[in-house]
Swiss-Prot record:
Keyword Metal-binding appears in the UniProt entry: yes
Signal peptide: 1-20
Binding-site residues for Zn(2+), renumbered to this chain: H187, H191, H197
PROSITE patterns with a match to the protein in the record: ASTACIN (PS51864), ZINC_PROTEASE (PS00142)
Gene this protein is translated from: nas-4
Protein name as it appears in the record: Zinc metalloproteinase nas-4
Organism: Caenorhabditis elegans
Lineage: Eukaryota, Metazoa, Ecdysozoa, Nematoda, Chromadorea
Amino acid sequence: MMTIQRYSLVFCAIFATCWTASVVNNKQVIDTSVPQTETTLNDADFHSDLHQRYDLQTLGIKVKDDPTIGNYSEGDILLESPKKFVEENNKLGRNAIKQIYRRWPNNEIPYTLSSQYGSYARSVIANAMNEYHTKTCVKFVARDPSKHHDYLWIHPDEGCYSLVGKTGGKQPVSLDSGCIQVGTIVHELMHAVGFFHEQSRQDRDSYIDVVWQNVMNGADDQFEKYNLNVISHLDEPYDYASIMHYGPYAFSGSGKKTLVPKKSGSERMGQRVKFSDIDVRKINKLYNCPGVSGNNNNNNNNQINSNSIVNHPQV
């Protein structure tokens, strides 16, 4: 028995393939004792095996699969309210604000990362960025202060949130310990790329009913719709499986459903596991990505694995 264990340890040391849940600790997620400075990811983060799904709840971390932060517009968008966003953009003459606030130039999104993220969090964030790198032409690049004035500042504030599109300067994206999951990070970064939530579409009432009596007090504005002067559907159908869609219990004040689908194909509504095919196509259309894999119509938009089953969010 000891011989088997010895050989196993040697194999792990040589091939670095034996990352187990037992070696994850809270400081490998976020270590607030570290002075907060701006860093970037390195090659080791992008090639690490540490991103493999880990149950953060075993560390006492409250996981935020579907954040419902009442102080933010639509739960995780850093705006005062959807209405204010529309009013501000009306003042701008409704200038090409279709589905994005501002598009990032050259399909590159510069970023910096808080030094408080540990090795596990860094690998998960890198894996989420890799989803964009392999399926779209959008690239997250380490900020070069000499040429990047506008950039994302990814740090552990309170909850998970992002602004929509490029807003200028040092632009915050918050990923606290409960947000360190690949799907949740992909979702927040998709806001930064330029997308609102799927159920904000003008045509959403043809696909879902909002059960207003089940919505928590003061949260009605979390279900605002944007008209086509503000967002574009990019000629894509409504997507229940989008990583940008709310789950059925979002902002529930009673534990009952707030969103009820009207059509079939909604089994994974609210999933936070991976892009749907339509998500990928929309990003590629928005950024004019040429010949990027993932633009095919292989009719598997709703084929998300069993880990994506949506549970009642903590509200």
